[in-house]
Structure formats: structure tokens, C-alpha cells
Amino acid sequence: MYEISADPARLDVARVHRWLSTDAYWALGRSLAKQQAAIAGSLNFGAYATDTGVQVAYARVVTDLATFAWLCDVYVAPEARGHGLGTSLVTAVRDHLAPHGLRRVLLATDDAHGVYAKVGFEPLAEPGKWMVLPLAPVPAGQDRRGRQAEPTASAEPAR
């Protein structure tokens, strides 16, 4: 069993940082200082094993709690996966935000569409209306999503 909480004092920041910086494709290599700043400027949720109190999942929401929210950094520890915890965590986030009257909550995912669909997320109706402003350079060897970049073909013909 798990307990989900938005109490920032319960977060195991070192554990969250380790998960995201070493195992989450979108945050590989993220520094501890960057993670601490992200936590400080966000609404954070943790899932904790009820028998041990150990944190087993995390989610972060960037929001003004008036008009908009961005759900990000959703992570379930490998040993806790496959039991519906991701869906429960995102449901708790949705339920926490619902009373605020936000028009929408956005997220980006490469591989968990099914989890989010169970909670009510759907693809953008008009994705062509959305744009991104990349501000930070892409680290060498990575693409914009933080994944290992595919080798590019050389402009020189092979000899």
C-alpha cells in the first residue's frame, strides 16, 4: 500500500534527484542544484510505502493555481511499477488541482500515454498551435528530449 502526499517536508530530494538524473530520459544528468530549484518552484507529490515510509514515486507540477499547470517529472521507482501506482499518483495530482478551476493541465510523454489517458488526459486537439522556445543548448550527444542522439551521416562520401 502507498500513501500519496503533497507535503514538501516528506520528499526525499536525494532519491528524487537520483531517479531523475540517472533513469529518466528527460532529465538525465540534471544537477542536484537544478533539481532543488525545480522542487522549490513547484507543487510536489510523493508516494510513500505505508509500511516503511520510503518514497517510491514522485510528480511535480508547475502552476499558478489559477489558469494553468504543467505536470512533469512523473517517476515511479522500478520496484513499485506494475501495480497502478503511476495512475494513482496522477489521479491524486488531478484531484488536488481540480478545486482551483484550472482550464487545463499539460504534460509531455514518450511512453506513458495509457497511464495518463486513464486519468482523463487526451492528445492536444490542435498541436500546431503550440510552440516551444528552447533556451538552453542541447548537451553533446543528446537530442532535445535528453536521449542519446542518433549519429548523423557525414557530408563526405565514404571512400
Question: Which residue ranges define each predicted feature?
Answer:
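Conserved active-site alpha-helix within GNAT-family acetyltransferase domains
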Residues: 99-105, 109-135
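Active-site signature of alpha/beta-hydrolase-fold catalytic machinery across serine-
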Residues: 92
